[in-house]
């Protein structure tokens, strides 16, 4: 009958469908065309937190016996900035133990600019440290190399790096116990380093993403 058991997902009640549609039909095609003309890169950026208490997921178990995973209950989390590139599948990332803020974001972007030579179209959401005066000044100062593009509000489903975060959590933290914070860091860094060597896997995320939201790939 075409039905299958699927996990539901939350959808914000603040969605602006007109802006979301405009992104698909107007903004994204313009970015793609401009990037191809300039032979530039298109980076989708986002951040993720990986808490020491781990994360839970489905797993096999005997009927009537719910799996249990030990947890430290500690709320400290390893935070990661990430960018994935649309044409090449390259992954750039930086883990931090501090806070996501304008300064840490600028530091990350500065490192990315130092490691690349092409013009970059950076697509990200409207997080405060993305839109702050300090960050906007950074974009203005680096306009020769960097063009900021903003996703529609409340639209994480329009950012393909979300699929990567899910994969990282599945491999690095799902159903795992971390007695020490350093163990989380090692697990996440190992997983990210692996994906950084799997450009085709990252490119596959873009294909899935484009099919999901109806974008031209």
Place the predicted regions along the sequence by residue:
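Short functional hotspots at interaction and active-site rims
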Residues: 1-217
């Amino acid at each position: 009958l075409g039905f299958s058991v699927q996990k539901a997902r939350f959808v914000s009640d603040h969605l602006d469908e007109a802006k979301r549609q405009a992104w698909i039909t107007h903004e994204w095609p313009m970015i793609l065309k401009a990037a191809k003309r300039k032979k530039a890169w298109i980076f989708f950026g986002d951040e993720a937190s990986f808490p020491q208490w781990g994360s839970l997921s489905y797993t096999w178990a005997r009927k009537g016996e719910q799996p249990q995973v030990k947890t430290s209950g500690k709320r400290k989390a390893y935070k990661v900035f990430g960018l994935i590139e649309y044409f090449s599948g390259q992954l750039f990332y930086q883990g931090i133990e501090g806070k996501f803020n304008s300064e840490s974001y600028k530091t990350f972007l500065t490192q990315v600019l130092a490691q690349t030579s092409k013009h970059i179209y950076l697509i990200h959401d409207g997080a405060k440290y993305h839109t702050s005066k300090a960050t906007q000044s950074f974009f203005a100062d680096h306009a020769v190399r960097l063009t900021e593009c903003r996703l529609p509000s409340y639209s994480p489903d329009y950012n393909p790096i979300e699929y990567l975060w899910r994969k990282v959590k599945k491999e690095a933290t799902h159903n795992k116990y971390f007695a020490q914070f350093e163990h989380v860091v090692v697990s996440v860094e190992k997983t990210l380093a692996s994906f950084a060597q799997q450009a085709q896997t990252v490119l596959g995320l873009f294909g899935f993403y484009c099919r999901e939201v109806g974008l031209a790939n």
